A protein has these predicted regions:
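A conserved active-site cap/scaffold subdomain adjacent to cofactor or substrate pockets
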Residues: 241-287, 291-310
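Nucleotide/pyrophosphate-binding catalytic subdomain
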Residues: 1-256, 261, 420
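Structural motif
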Residues: 1-2, 29-32, 71, 113, ...
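A conserved regulatory-domain signal marking ACT and ACT-like small-molecule sensing domains
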Residues: 282-439
């Protein structure tokens, strides 16, 4: 059995939903994970913001506009009056439910319930369309089997057990439709897997059913070897190792959510990135296979802050780095890059929520300097240290660009450069020319 996930743009209109239906109805049994229609989650966040500010009138105005859009989608999606009516009833039910939260105290709990409505609506609409077309499909409520534990991490044992129970109720179905993103927490409350969580849902489901393949369908032709919005002549990458894909996803390749990789990797289930706008394109296959000695892609991560701590007390001392790291840990701030010398250490962070407190604590140990508006450029591939030559190529491409930090050796798949954000475009283009375009 395969697991297919379609993002918001892939189900962003009635026509797109019809195209998705064509893609999934090939006679093979499969589980299909759907996001909310594009723009819906952002609008639900906007509604929530109004309710936090105790402005139910503003919230209701947006609710009415969104409901009108959905009524139009229903009219365009279904051919028969019977299913138009079914669609309208679903729309009314969910929007009445959203409106019920405009009358009382609004908290984070209520916001998560409101945000869940987008996926619940899109899956109901697609399931009805498949049934109207005569396809044997059924809706599997994600809230019946997707759960996180007390640490807000997915509970794979629970997911596998409860999902199997749901599947056994409908053994003869061709298509099982379910929601991405949404789940219940350890206390049974409606929750979610955060933004991009639909990828995570698909990967968790794939691992739970031991899928033959997980397919992530978006509006892009697989993972590219550089950012096509910035760089000329990028090309799709046809094959990636799981660790290469994880590096690229973390460092800015938005086609895939970083957390999606792990369940599939550990279950050894290949993940294929495909394009709903060009379904015949080969896309990108992610697996545990490695192409030896090959550089695959370049990615960039913005909004990076670099912090340098210089201290003579670090010279020949033990325990200094532990004290530094404990400061970042106490403020729940992750470090992206790190470089050390005999008398100093430089680190980068992308979460500056507690920057001032961190700097105050670090000043106890030495002189602290900060560089903001920085960017991490990440070169990804099979970069085992025995493979010679790739460092020289990457450094040669960066020869005219001021580099604040270089990180290599922590991973066999990544060499990272810290530069100013204003130099990002020229750095990405130069790396593409040197590594992929043979200039």
């Amino acid at each position: 059995m395969k697991v297919l996930k379609f993002g918001g743009t892939s189900v962003g209109s009635a026509q797109r939903m019809k195209e998705v239906a064509k893609l999934i109805t090939d006679g093979e049994q499969k589980i299909v994970v759907l996001s909310a229609m594009s723009g819906t989650t952002n609008t639900l966040v906007e509604i929530s913001d109004y309710l936090y500010k105790k402005n139910p009138e503003g919230a209701n105005e947006i609710i009415n506009k969104l409901e009108s859009k959905y009524k139009q989608h229903v009219d365009e999606l279904y051919a028969t009056q019977e299913y138009k009516q079914k669609g309208l009833e679903v729309i009314k039910s969910h929007f009445d439910y959203i409106r019920s939260y405009t009358k009382d105290l609004f908290t984070l709990f209520e916001e998560k319930v409101v945000l869940a409505q987008g996926e619940l609506i899109s899956t109901a609409m697609v399931n009805f369309y498949l049934q109207e077309c005569g396809v044997k499909s059924v809706l599997l409520p994600a809230l019946e089997f997707m759960r996180t534990d007390k640490n807000a991490e997915p509970d794979p044992v629970y997911i596998k057990e409860k999902l199997q129970t749901q599947l056994e109720l409908y053994p003869d179905m061709e298509i099982y439709i379910t929601q991405g993103f949404i789940c219940r927490n350890a206390y049974g409350e409606i929750d979610n897997l955060q933004r991009g969580g639909s990828d995570y849902t698909a990967s968790l489901i794939g691992a739970a059913v031991n899928a033959s393949e997980i397919q992530i369908w978006t509006d892009i032709d697989g993972m590219h070897n550089n950012d096509p919005r910035i760089v000329d002549k990028t090309a799709p990458v046809r094959q990636l190792h799981f660790d290469e894909a994880a590096e690229l996803a973390y460092f800015g390749a938005n086609i895939l959510h970083p957390t999606c990789i792990q369940p599939a990797k550990y279950a050894n289930i290949p993940v294929r990135l495909l394009n709903t706008m060009d379904p015949d394109a080969p896309g990108t296959l992610i697996s545990n296979d490695t192409e030896k000695g090959k550089i695959k892609a370049v990615a960039a991560k913005n909004n990076i802050t670099a912090i340098k701590i210089k201290s003579s007390r670090m010279l020949l001392a033990h325990g200094f780095l532990r004290k530094v790291f404990e400061i970042f840990e106490s403020y729940q701030t992750s470090i992206d890059m790190i470089c050390t010398s005999e008398v100093g250490v430089s680190v980068t962070i992308d979460n500056t929520k507690h920057l001032n407190e961190i700097l105050d604590d670090l000043k106890k140990y030495g002189t602290v300097t900060v560089d903001k508006d920085m960017c991490i450029i990440c070169v990804v591939g099979d970069l085992e240290w025995e493979n010679v030559g790739f460092e020289a190529k990457a450094l040669d491409a960066m020869r005219d660009i001021p580099v604040r930090m270089i990180s290599f050796g922590g991973s066999n798949y990544n060499i990272s450069f810290l530069i100013r954000e204003c130099d990002k475009k020229i750095a990405l283009q130069s790396l593409s020319d040197m590594l992929f375009n043979n200039k």
